[in-house]
Amino acid sequence: MERRDFLKVTVLTGATAALSGCEKPAQKLVRFLPEERLEPGVATWKPSVCTLCPAGCGLLVRVMEGEAEVVRNGQRGLIRMGLAKKLEGNPQHPVNRGKLCTRGQAGLQITYHPDRVRGPLKRSGTRGSGQFQEIEWDEALGEVAQRLKELRSQDRAGTIRFLTGRSRGQRAELVNEFLTALGSPPAIAFDPLDEPVLRQANLLSFGRAAMPSFDLARAGYVLSFGADFLGTWNSPVAQAAGYGEMRQGHPGSRGKLVQLEQRMSQTGANADEWVPVRPGTEGALALGLAHVILRQKLRPAKEDGAAQLIAGWAQGLPDYSPEDVEKKTGVAAKRIERLAREAAEHAPAVAMVGGAPLAHTNGLFTALAVNALNSLLGSVGSAGGMFFTPQPQLTERERRVAAEDQGSGHRLGAALDGAHALLLHNANPVFAAPAAWGMRERLEKIPFIVSFGSFVDETSALADVILPDHSPLESWLDDVPESGTGQALVSLAAPTMSPLHDTRAMPDVLLEVAHRLGGDVGKALPWQNFEERLRVSLPKVTARTKTKELEDEQRSWNEMLEQGGWWSDELEKLASMSGRPASEESAKKFTAAPLAAAQFAAPQFDGAENDFPFQFQPFVSQAFLDGSLAHLPWMQEMPDVLSTVMWGTWVEINPQTAASLGIVQGDLVEVRSQHGKLQAPALVTPANSPGVIAMPMGQGHDNFGRYASGRGANPMAILAPMQVSQTGSLAWAATRVSVSKVGQARLALFSGGLQERPEELKQR
């Protein structure tokens, strides 16, 4: 061999050896036998349930054969199995009828996310350090059962707490049955997307502590007080379908949508008329409209039900003349009179309220005022109006729980302060609650925390043990959607694919822990798994709705699985779903709010106006909602509907406000309240009222996987712990802030965003 050739071989061999030394040790992967018979290249569609927002839409999941790396019996290997490839809406499901929003489409990424917790973990470092070690399920379950057993033996079962996010159906029932068997208090619900103020108002006005549904398809006129019903509020897919029918389903009549708010939402951008209103004065505006209708006798006067809750109603609301309301709201008196006449003359008309108007200190009054306006318009339980989706009958305990905002600061704080053990499922209060509530500090004092999280978020990072749940597509699911349809329904779904990782369903884990505890706890939860519980319990749930179709003999288990649940064949009569006002005696059982003499009080704000001149208005993100979807890359790269911003947070400032502060688009600004400060790029936009600083929720995670962590800022960090009067709910729109330029920033825009209209085109 020539010397030159020898050197070439030597160099190549050495380089190869060096590179191989940098590689990770090869994992031993076995090949498992296929778990099911699938024909290559042929899709199977399986029904499921979307769990990403409160709407509860039905899904169809396209499953095809593929190869995946999985864990079976503690061993990692490769297998040919059915893999979920695409999500679509279930055409038969009464809520979404085949439609699915972008958030629902992104649900697929939860299953295949690279940052999923793949097996049980035990904390190995200091609390909050994020240091965990892998353990076996037997060890993890044994430790949880032993800790709970010790607390029971010490008569401290009452100090065991279970904190959930949005939860309903049999999962919620099972959790509370588990807690009852332990001798512990009911689960605490913490859902930032819930509307507890509206629930309490609906209980007082209609006897139903529930979210309303709307027959938009037959409406002729819609007044929306801050409710982004086409974007993020309530049941957006169902409401968008109804809105589309209102626009295009009646030749010669398109209906009219009027949106009244401070920051233009997706619904506001679609409205025929957008009316900017001073923050916290929407209730006065609703009664100003009612005053005109009563004074001009445009509709028959209503002096019962919801109307009785409003002071001065019987006298024609003398304190709410258009001129007086103009002073409160900034909406011109002539415009108020015109809107009132239009609403009365273009029946059927309906009003709705949600979002920021209910997040002021006077939010309960605002909701009661809009309910009274609906009563006057004749829209309650009528075609083109509002109603309540049929639900299983509630016990008094369930109704009380529904009426209370358990996730409010003082209730949640009081419950956690005395806890010796905390179980967490689908709740992240360290991120989603105001920093002023001190959730991190409270949780750090709890001796034992168990998380069922599929991801290590800010709250799960404080856990002692993580018992990862299956993804929704790998789980048995049931749901009872609360709004969006006039049909009684119960959704049901079997797993659409086998688990990829060494995870277990949260209900199955609770059942296993109950069996390990034995005694009364084991007897109270006799089922071997959640599937068995569903088979036994669903017929009882459906029978409680008292409709003839819901007898369990008429719908077999297999039929429910095939179509994705059970629902009545026909719409119920809307009049039967209108509810009735709560009596004074029954209302006092569920709320401290008065039944009579509700009257406008100016909203209160935290922070002196001289030091903090702007009202701070966080809004629910189109992509991330409250932040629970920020870990999904499809959501990060999706442009915001109005601003077109991607991969970040922004602060919306009106052009007039920005000019007065010397701020231009892209400047890095500091937003400061009495409770903290944050920095984000400025977005100068006419979609925001002067004097209002708006910012999307959802970004600013410290701990939520590679796509969310360290990205943007969290507006909850600077909110004041203000409460909605007489409810205890968080008044998240009651914080004042200051804004100042601190530097330059990069703002990723897909396009130019909204532009201000020429002055001559603006509607007065």
Q: What label would you give each PLM region?
A:
Residues 1-298, 304-305, 309-312, 323-324, ...:
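N-terminal export/assembly segments and adjacent metallocofactor-ligating motifs
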Residues 47-49, 159, 176, 224-227, ...:
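A cross-kingdom feature strongest in bacterial/archaeal respiratory oxidoreductases
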Residues 70-72, 84-85, 299-302, 336-337, ...:
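Acidic/polar loop patches that form or flank catalytic/metal-binding clefts of enzymes
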Residues 127-134, 291, 295-331, 496-582, ...:
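N-terminal leader/propeptide and maturation segments of large enzyme subunits in energy/redox metabolism
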Residues 159-168, 324-331, 354-361, 393-394, ...:
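Conserved short loop/turn motifs at secondary-structure junctions
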Residues 186-197, 253-257, 376-393, 446-459:
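A generic structural motif
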Residues 215-217, 343-344, 415-417, 443:
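Extracellular/periplasmic catalytic domains that process cell-envelope and extracellular macromolecules
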Residues 343-416, 482-483, 565, 588, ...:
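A glycine-rich, hydrophobic/aromatic-adjacent loop/helix-cap motif
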